[in-house]
Curated annotation (Swiss-Prot):
One Pfam family from the record: LSM
Note, other: Patients with systemic lupus erythematosus produce antibodies which interact with snRNP proteins.
Principal localisation: cytoplasm
Gene name linked to the record: SNRPE
Subcellular location: Cytoplasm, Cytosol; Nucleus
One function term, GO molecular function aspect: RNA binding
PANTHER family linked to this entry: SMALL NUCLEAR RIBONUCLEOPROTEIN E
Involvement in disorder: Hypotrichosis 11: A form of hypotrichosis, a condition characterized by the presence of less than the normal amount of hair and abnormal hair follicles and shafts, which are thin and atrophic. The extent of scalp and body hair involvement can be very variable, within as well as between families. HYPT11 is an autosomal dominant form characterized by scanty or absent eyebrows and a highly variable degree of alopecia since birth, ranging from slight thinning of scalp and axillary hair to complete loss of scalp and body hair. Pubic hair remains mainly unaffected.
This protein's GO CC annotations: catalytic step 2 spliceosome; cytosol; methylosome; nucleoplasm; nucleus; pICln-Sm protein complex; precatalytic spliceosome; small nuclear ribonucleoprotein complex
One GO term (biological process): mRNA splicing, via spliceosome
Protein name from the UniProt record: Small nuclear ribonucleoprotein E
Keyword Transmembrane helix found: no
Domain Sm per the UniProt entry, residue ranges: 18-92
Keywords: Cytoplasm, Disease variant, Hypotrichosis, mRNA processing, mRNA splicing, Nucleus, Ribonucleoprotein, RNA-binding, Spliceosome
Amino acid sequence: MAYRGQGQKVQKVMVQPINLIFRYLQNRSRIQVWLYEQVNMRIEGCIIGFDEYMNLVLDDAEEIHSKTKSRKQLGRIMLKGDNITLLQSVSN
């Protein structure tokens, strides 16, 4: 355990991945998904549902090609968890 100054304890709390995804869902955060073995393409959208396999339902999804910076509107999609490498929140 880490300590700070006058004997005050600093407690580190582990965050479960499912809790982070749930927070993105609750806050209606726009997220960017990095895809497995698709380094030049990313998906952005708002999580409106997910399951224990990390399958995501995204609303207002866009396919983003990083080399050409082009965007393709996809609408509402279901993205299988097997395709997900990283999730990050993006500002609108």
